[in-house]
């Protein structure tokens, strides 16, 4: 199941994530790491339990959780772990995480991992962080603005803003472009970018 997370570009999500995101900055003002905590919905979490509970005890032990983390690390690599970062309009590539830690609590799969830029990236001008699935198969939600944070030295000199686009307004403003062909593009669409909650940092 996990290897098939973003199987197609459907117009509505099938997997739901309650997420927390933290931009950690180094003393020199560069991005140290992007910390992610993902809590999956109960339906998807149950399917993961069915797939990985080799012991048949209705839970996931350390070995099984390690297998879950490895599967996610491998399967989401081609999707950039749903992480999209731009610095003054230029994309910032992210390196593959060293590992993804998986846990299973109260019927929910929880993934914790950190990403680092492939090259040293300083917070200068406008840096935008978006966590979203371009295929629209998975919905990533940040319940409050405090779930997208900035820490480290840059937190004192930079301004942080969480942007939550209104889907209805986005549809109205882009009505001509949002055709059925647009949504059926297997490579994903710009619509996910238009409606995704994002963290904007001005330095």
Task: Pin down the residues of each PLM region.
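N-terminal signal peptide c-region/cleavage motif recognized by signal peptidases
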Residues: 6-8
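Cleaved targeting-peptide boundary
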Residues: 10-17
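Short, well-ordered beta-strand segments enriched in hydrophobic/aromatic residues
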Residues: 21, 29-40, 109-117
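Short beta-strand segments of immunoglobulin-like
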Residues: 21-23, 100
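Short acidic-glycine loop/turn motifs at beta-strand connectors
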Residues: 26-28, 88
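Structured domain cores in non-transmembrane regions
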Residues: 44-122
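Mature, soluble, non-transmembrane domains
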Residues: 88-203
